[in-house]
């Protein structure tokens, strides 16, 4: 099979389809769980769980110091240069960094929660302490999963964390509700943390077996300082690319009631089905882009990106149309009080459409080594998000939060597109993709 057929639209679609199916399945299970939780314990208690879990996700993302998003570039380079020792060293040292930092972050956050219990939603520390206990587990799951993605072991990368864990969480929580008729954020967070522990341990052993079968047993090479220099800018990129919903939930927590947080989160999670599709395409094309850029095959790189952008944009347009027609019934599944979030959901879906139109600009900047140029972009986006939330949310509530997401997404997508054109030398937007038909 030649390189061109390997990177064709059908190949991208085929590779992305599995990742997309895993992520959509996981998202659907999570949505079903949140629908059930909204009915079993109410929007207010659901809001407490969402805020606690959002803190877990965000702190886990910060804890890896950029090692996780840097994995594709570092392992891609090691594979291109045939340096198995570098792969062994990165897997070992990266795991050590992630574990030590995440434990430190979790302990520090737990101490703050104990001191500030009276200011927490519901004035209870238990869900937050459990969420912080899960921070090291989730950080390790993310790091190990990205190593699997670098080798295109998509089943290992996505099935345990995206499908099996949410499915078991749903089944166990449902069983607890059926047998006790009582449920709260603390119980759900306890089950979530337990399943993360099982997932992290299983991934560790599966990944070790895979690496031993794939990589020659050479002495480990360590370039820790260089890896951190690569990873730290990517950390800020990944926060916006993958954890912005959790960031928004945390910003909203002190400003609106927990039931409104639950409505915003439900609207955002539905809109993020579009992002799952885009992420699935990125998961398949990012390792390919890293190798093509390292090999200086710019024309083939642009062709791969053009096909990926077309696929992502067409899927996004279709999804927005579906949400416009069926959005209210979908939100109504959570409960009658959630239907008011339809306008919010459409604004959030529009933000994902903007992102798809720009093309995979974020992953392109990451895997081509231009992540340093993104620092000012996402630092500005972070400041803009905070300012807009404090300006718009007090007056417009969750609609103001959705407009914040749209404006911030438009800003960083446009800015990154210009950087890709100038630094990578290709035009990834949908306008160029269709112009080249």
How should each PLM-predicted stretch be described?
Residues 1-29, 220-237, 416-419, 429-437:
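N-terminal membrane topogenesis motif
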Residues 31-45, 177, 242-273, 291, ...:
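Helix-terminus/linker motif at the lipid-water interface of multi-pass membrane proteins
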Residues 36, 47-64, 233, 248-249, ...:
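Alpha-helical transmembrane segments of polytopic membrane transporters and translocases
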Residues 65-81, 150, 249, 267, ...:
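Helix-loop junctions and terminal segments of transmembrane helices
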Residues 129, 159-211, 380-384, 398-422:
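Hydrophobic alpha-helical transmembrane segments
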